[in-house]
C-alpha cells in the first residue's frame, strides 16, 4: 500500500509513476474490505476512531500460527475521540479523507442514534498509487461488499468481522 513502484518478479521490470503509457484496468475483487479499513463512529457531532484489539478466546495458544486461531478470535473495540485534523499527516489524500469524515460528522452529528462508518483507506491509497503509474488514467472494476446508502450506517455498533479462511472487516 505504501510502495510507489512495483518490480515484476520474472522480468525484473520496474513499474513506477508515469511509466505506463496506456490506461490501467484494475480488477479489485474484494479489495475494499480487505486492505486496512479505518473504523469511525459519529456521536453528538464528535468523530471517534475505532481501535481493535485481537486476541484468542483461549488463555494460551499452543501454536499462534495455527490457521484455526481465526475461529477463536476475541475482538475488543475501543472508540477514541479525534480532532478535525485527524489525517493531517497524510500525503495528498489528506484533504479528501478529511472532507469525507467531516461530511459524515455533519450528516450524522445531530442524529440521536449516531453512526458507524468503515472507510476503505488502504484500498484508496493503493488505487491512488496504481493510477499514478498511468498518470491518473485508470478504470476500476470492483466486486465487493458494502453499503451505498448512508442511512445504512445509522447506529453505534462494532464492525462485522467476516471469517473465510482469512478475515475481513
Per-region residue spans from a language model:
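Class I S-adenosyl-L-methionine
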Residues: 9-169
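Conserved nucleotide-cofactor-binding alpha/beta core module
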Residues: 1-3
Amino acid at each position: 500500500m505504501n510502495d510507489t513502484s512495483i518490480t515484476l518478479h520474472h522480468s525484473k521490470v520496474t513499474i513506477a509513476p508515469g511509466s505506463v503509457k496506456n490506461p490501467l484496468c484494475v480488477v479489485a475483487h474484494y479489495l475494499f474490505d480487505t486492505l486496512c479499513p479505518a473504523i469511525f463512529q459519529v456521536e453528538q457531532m464528535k468523530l471517534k476512531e475505532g481501535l481493535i484489539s485481537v486476541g484468542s478466546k483461549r488463555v494460551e495458544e499452543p501454536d499462534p500460527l495455527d490457521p484455526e486461531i481465526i475461529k477463536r478470535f476475541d475482538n475488543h473495540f475501543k472508540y477514541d475521540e479525534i480532532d478535525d485534523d485527524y489525517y493531517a499527516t497524510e500525503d495528498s489524500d489528506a484533504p479528501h479523507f478529511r472532507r469525507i469524515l467531516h461530511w459524515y460528522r455533519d450528516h450524522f452529528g445531530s442524529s440521536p442514534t449516531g453512526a458507524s462508518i468503515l472507510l476503505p483507506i488502504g484500498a484508496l491509497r493503493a488505487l491512488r498509487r496504481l493510477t499514478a503509474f498511468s498518470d491518473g488514467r485508470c478504470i476500476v472494476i470492483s466486486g465487493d461488499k458494502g453499503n451505498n446508502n448512508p442511512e445504512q450506517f445509522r447506529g453505534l455498533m462494532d464492525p462485522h468481522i467476516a471469517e473465510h479462511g482469512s478475515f475481513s472487516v
